[in-house]
Regions:
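Transmembrane helix-loop junctions in multi-pass membrane proteins
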Residues: 51-61, 131-135, 163-174, 232-238, ...
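Mid-bilayer segments of alpha-helical transmembrane spans in multi-pass integral membrane proteins
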Residues: 77-89, 109-121, 125, 153
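Long hydrophobic segments that form regular secondary structure
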Residues: 242-273, 280-281, 346-418
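N-terminal alpha-helical transmembrane segments of multi-pass membrane transport
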Residues: 1-79, 123-124, 131-139, 143-184, ...
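Hydrophobic alpha-helical transmembrane segments of multi-pass membrane proteins
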Residues: 42-46, 106-117, 126, 149, ...
């Protein structure tokens, strides 16, 4: 897909690709200088942000809003639009009580696709810059974006969504269901004046919608923004251990595959495997650390005589370890594994609450976040994040041994190191200054 015009999917998606080029007046054979490539990416992102903002503000007047949700407030709409446009997927709202089905699909899920495709396109352009010798161009952003969406993301998402539906993930356009409780519940409420009242709840609202189609791209594109507030801990997003396994595989699928792409495009497959191996070693070290401390349980509970050992006898079952904030159907292993994967990949999807981890168990997810996407990382971003680290390492190693630093046959010059350091400092600068 990156360096060949034909794939085995060309018969299916080729006509669609050519139609998109014709409608958008894109010359697929025209390549762009890095400045034009960057400008196209920024322009596409800004337009996408404005469209998503408008969708949220006009939500009440648009179709596929069976619950009649009002338009999203201006500040929240901008927050959400900028978040999903940049593949951040930070959420300051509950999806099931704020967003209509149309906004979830045409707005949020759409940006799950194109933000991921943008990241992959930038990674491919980065690799082209390393692999090419004399060329002054890096490819065509519009072609890379289109092909990534059609030939990579869409096929995997179609298959993945069907697999998730088979496991019980919801996919419909039905209004929320009002279910009568078998046993009414008494709920104590406090009004603005501090007066307490007791309300009897007899009906439960069961939220639903086109979840499976958004869930798979949420993981495959390392987006992370959930259809429901509970994210992948919600049984309608992630009902079974097998769906949990599929979603974890999806998170790492593209980021790990891009290391192979690196080897193929540079003509040095051993180097691609070396990068992959470095990522795997760091990932496994993180996972086993999280699992060890979570399986041991909370030491404070031990002081109070609370049993945290696994029990399955005399009709009693207990998973063991620190189960606070974790789903029983996943247990310690799947929760620790998911926490490591999602923070390695900057995905943001969760199947347990990381704040409820033990201090040392929760340290690893926090460390993964602070590393800035080098252990597989987000789709595209993880690869070029690791490559930046490699450039800096090669440069420092060259200084130590007194040799001119080279990477894949190219000299590492002062301007290259300056750009690499700029990449590193922007991350720290953004956190320190804006906090």
């Amino acid at each position: 897909m990156c360096y060949s015009d034909l794939t085995f999917l060309s018969r299916v998606f080729g006509p669609v690709e050519r139609l998109i080029y014709r409608i958008c007046r894109i010359d697929e054979h025209e390549e762009q200088h890095w400045t034009a490539y960057t400008a196209a990416m920024l322009m596409f992102s800004v337009v996408g942000l404005l469209v998503l903002y408008g969708l949220q503000r006009l939500q009440y007047f648009l179709p596929l809003n069976p619950q009649g949700f009002p338009g999203v407030a201006p500040d929240l709409a901008f927050n959400t639009a900028s978040s999903f446009t940049t593949n951040t997927n930070w959420q300051a709202y509950s999806g099931e009580s704020t967003m209509s089905y149309l906004v979830q699909m045409a707005g949020l899920a759409f940006h799950n696709f194109v933000s991921a495709a943008t990241g992959i396109a930038l990674a491919i352009a980065f690799i082209r810059g390393i692999a090419r010798r004399e060329a002054k161009t890096l490819g065509n952003f519009w072609v890379d974006l289109t092909r990534t969406t059609l030939y990579v993301l869409l096929p995997f998402c179609i298959i993945g969504a069907l697999a998730l539906v088979s496991q019980g993930v919801v996919q419909n356009f039905s209004p929320y269901t009002q279910a009568t409780l078998v046993e009414p519940q008494q709920v104590e409420k406090t009004d603005d004046r501090g007066n307490k009242t007791v309300e009897t709840v007899t009906v439960q609202t069961i939220a639903q919608g086109p979840v499976a189609s958004q869930e798979i791209i949420k993981e495959l594109g390392t987006n992370g923004g959930g259809f429901f507030n509970a994210n992948s801990a919600h049984p309608f997003e992630n009902p079974t251990p097998f769906s949990n396994f599929l979603e974890m595989i999806a998170v790492f699928a593209i980021s790990s595959g891009l290391t192979y792409t690196l080897g193929r495009m540079t003509g040095n497959q051993k180097h691609g495997w070396a990068v992959f191996s470095a990522m795997v070693i760091l990932f496994l070290a993180g996972f086993f650390t999280v699992y060890y401390f979570e399986a041991r349980g909370n030491p404070i509970f031990n002081q109070h005589g609370v049993t945290q050992a696994a029990i399955e006898a005399d009709g009693q079952e207990q998973a063991g370890g620190n189960m606070e904030g974790k789903e029983v159907r996943f247990g310690i292993v799947n929760s620790a594994l998911w926490a490591t994967i999602t923070t390695d990949a900057s995905c943001g999807a969760v199947n347990s609450m990381h704040d409820s981890f033990t201090p040392l168990g929760g340290m690893i997810p926090l460390l993964n976040i602070m590393l800035g996407e080098i252990i597989f990382g987000g789709v595209g971003a993880g690869l070029y994040g690791m490559l930046v680290m490699i450039v800096l390492t090669v440069f420092i190693a060259g200084l130590m041994v007194g040799r001119t630093p080279e990477y894949l046959g190219k000299k590492i010059e002062a301007k290259d190191v300056k750009m690499a350091m700029l990449y590193v400092l922007v991350f720290a600068f953004s956190i320190l200054v804006f906090s």
